[in-house]
Amino acid sequence: MSRPYEEILNGGTLPRSAPGDRHETICARLHREMAVSIAGLTGVQLLAPRTQVQIARATAFCPDLALVMAATGKLFLAAEIISRDDHRADTVTKKEIYEQHRVPRLWMVDPRYDNVEIYHSFEFGLKLHGILAGNEILQEKLVPQFKITMKELFA
């Protein structure tokens, strides 16, 4: 069973509710597919769900899925599964921090609507690259083996 946890935002704590069963099922599916997809890739490392990742000197988040560069530990891709109970922390607060620190890829996974918003970093912040739902496929060209349909992810 999941437990509540805390993230660090500008030196203060950001308490988070324990993820629910559906949240954890979606997280497990993402991790399973990503683990298979990066097998043999030496440049990236998949962290365990909600491993604390340093974003800035006084800010550390616990993404549901985090891919970091193996050589530097720098966050490359973060996936946040939005919780109905405290969605503002993910959809506003953390997204702004990810944007400020130019995290290259951000997936906002929304079980409320069974969709995923994909953001790519560019020189002015994060840009919405697409919103996927239904039979559409979540994929990342920098991890070419990773592919999962929205129906599979949210089943």
Describe each model-derived feature in a short phrase.
Residues M1-A155:
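Gly/Pro/Ser/Thr-rich low-complexity, intrinsically disordered segments predominantly at protein N-termini
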